Amino acid sequence: MNFAEEEPSKKYCIKGKHVAIICATVVAVGLIVGLSVGLTRSCEPGTTPAPSNPPPHTSTALPPQDQNVCPDSDDESGEWKNFRLPDFIQPVHYDLEVKVLMEEDRYTGIVSISVNLSKDTRDLWLHIRETRITKLPELRRPSGEQVPIRRCFEYKKQEYVVIQAEEDLAATSGDSVYRLTIEFEGWLNGSLVGFYRTTYTEDGQTKSIAATDHEPTDARKSFPCFDEPNKKATYNISLIHPKEYSALSNMPVEKKETLDNDWKKTTFMKSVPMSTYLVCFAVHQFTSIQRTSRSGKPLTVYVQPNQKQTAEYAANITKAVFDFFEDYFAMEYSLPKLDKIAIPDFGTGAMENWGLVTYRETNLLYDPLLSASSNQQRVASVVAHELVHQWFGNIVTMDWWDDLWLNEGFASFFEFLGVNHAEADWQMLSQVLLEDVLPVQEDDSLMSSHPVVVTVSTPAEITSVFDGISYSKGASILRMLQDWITPEKFQKGCQIYLENFKFKNAKTSDFWDSLEKASNQPVKEVMDTWTSQMGYPVVTVSGKQNVTQKRFLLDYKADPSQPPSALGYTWNIPIKWTENGNSNITVYYRSNREGITLNANLSGDGFLKINPDHIGFYRVNYEAETWDWIAETLSSNHMNFSSADRSSFIDDAFALARAQLLDYEKALNLTRYLTSEKDFLPWERVISAVSYIISMFEDDRELYPLIETYFRSQVKPIADSLGWQDTGSHITKLLRASVLGFACKMGAGEALGNASQLFEAWLKGNESIPVNLRLLVYRYGMQNSGNEAAWNYTLEQYQKTSLAQEKEKLLYGLASVKDVTLLARYLEMLKDPNIIKTQDVFTVIRYISYNSYGKSMAWNWIQLNWDYLVNRFTINDRYLGRIVTIAEPFNTELQLWQMQSFFAKYPNAGAGAKPREQVLETVKNNIEWLKLNRKSISEWFTSMP
């Protein structure tokens, strides 16, 4: 699964945090302030169309539980009170038939499950949620004899339906199985999980598509099942659907039947053994394009008919990366076909359902005439990510969700290898620094982080670990591991792992064992220190080659021994270092309490570069004079260091300064050379690294103008050099969008003028904005010259365009207006899915929070509408849980109190428990940081000529 859709692309905006403006009125009335009361200026009513009433299918109402076939019960007399399913019940095969009643927004179904029992029992239980059983379940012995059912009931605390037999059910042996048959009914509305319906417009006509999304615990919402990843079984799936629709599932079609004048039945081939979360089916009226893999497998992309041309790139990149992975993993893809389908309203970024991968449109469809280079890269990356899962996740699945990283960390790592193969000039093996390694190091330096392998025991905890630690830290430590044992042995170890656990489940220790066989290195001993405890070390260098380690934390006052870790927050570190262009690796074992001395033969003025290209998941701190030398070398000849090393120096220095381990003077001195910097990686990371300072002082009328002036001067040479013509290589286009956006952010008059000029010409219909500049033009054009007429025109264009990537950019433009009345209307539009799709609600809130006029409004709106959001999305929705992180830029005691009061009022955090911890910790750190650092930072910027 690709989850990172609620965050805007790095190419779209500076990922800086913004400080909320709280005026005297807000101070006075605190949390109960209404949006219109808490605004900073009065505004006349506008003419923007008011949101229409939500359509009926957005209701979260369930079918009536008539007849009480399996009534609710609090009976806890059996093992069903446990969160985990018992080991003695093992499903073997499902026969699943679903009838899709599109116009009624519901479906009916019947599932027959073949079950093995390893011990005698009278009770069977399996998962169900928000789906009703319409007939007393039927159970048959291996002989075919029907077993009398004493009763069935739903135990909703653990989302089970329990079936109790009148007689003992003897343990099975050999191929003998019990046969459990359940008839059920479900609703197609209310959310973007389970089996749901959404709509789209084709030539002015509203059409529907119904599809599933099951990871991690939503298969139980579609049909009764044993909904745990290690309960693998085979499936025969049939769909009965209106005759004007077609059907898809994991496997190819076996046969199609016409039932009558209105209905068809599509039956699919029997599947391989797979986990419930990978089961997928869809009913659609799409068209398709196809490629064929080198091994002869059909690779098909399904899209709306009017979007067919935008699927060409996805089809091409699929073939290139698919062929690469079949070779790399030395294992042929396991199914007869691989389909992809773009869902018009889709909750996650994409989902790797075996044989039928589902996508948000922004992640599959690319129009070379209308999409930006960043959009193209996003499509390639997500396609590659989901292709990795066809091996890591589908063929071999983690045994339980505590090892989620075996799926997502691996997909996040290998996606870069796949795209690098297909698009060799994109620098993808370096871009992993920008996309994964450096961003997640900030997350993992909080006390509220969590280990890569983490205990989870509720659906909310399961969904919450689909986060940066599982994805990006997982990818980062694999990158370090591959470099240590060599790429060739790493590849061999992956092949051993896939072969040994094909169609099975595995744990982290199983992967380590496979790599040890391939490399003859102590992989488990080293890597367990990176997966079983949170955080990472800072390696301190003294005397040029003596190194010690300690846990790196942003909060300098935090107790580094907490929460307790059996490993004591020390790591076995593969220390890579370069000397005169030659690389070496020394494993620094945690048992060396006093540190180690690297075996280098340095000359008097030599420099030992520790962690070249930031290959290891740790930070490096040098002595003060070494930092001075690095700054001087950057200024005199920055090309002495690789672009990745320049990025690493800057990111480490600013993180160390934020943690009070380095003077800010040393970190800021590293930026003096930027007038000579021309490469994408360093500029992209500089913009991110300094964004914390920018956000903390954005409301400081004395200091912020000095910050703006300095960075305007630093970015001007590269901005002038690149200009506003959308030309050059893929990387050049990404660089141009980043530096021009940064120039606009820093108030550069020429850049803002160009953005406004392009925006105003677009408003008049005179000119099309270059595709790679559209986001920053929509954003800064709206910010600087946007009025109500401009805002309404932008909204109209959003509603007219069919390309999802263009819609996303226009949503950001709408969020950038300074008119707070329009922002208030925009927030209320989030309640109308006819205007703003359900998938985009949290994206829009986050976009508004990036607006200095909207950041407090977005937070206030969340508080005022929390009950509505919980009712619409459920408390276990990971995107709802994470939306509280828009408050990360807050830095006052009042704002902290408001957050604490809000969380106290709504103590049930669901999937947001960890994000709440993290945002509170961050805001407390911000408050302390300002007290400690304003003076020294002010002195540095004041001293600038």
Curated annotation (Swiss-Prot):
Pfam families: ERAP1_C, Peptidase_M1, Peptidase_M1_N. Binds 1 zinc ion per subunit. Substrate specificity is modulated by calcium which enhances the enzymatic activity for cleavage of acidic residues while reducing its activity with basic residues. Inhibited by aminopeptidase inhibitors amastatin and bestatin. The chain crosses the membrane at residues 19-39. Residues 40-945 are extracellular. The active site is at residue 386. It comes from the Eukaryota. Its EC number is 3.4.11.7. The record marks 471 as: Transition state stabilizer. Belongs to the peptidase M1 family. Homodimer; disulfide-linked. This is Glutamyl aminopeptidase. It comes from Rattus norvegicus (Rat).
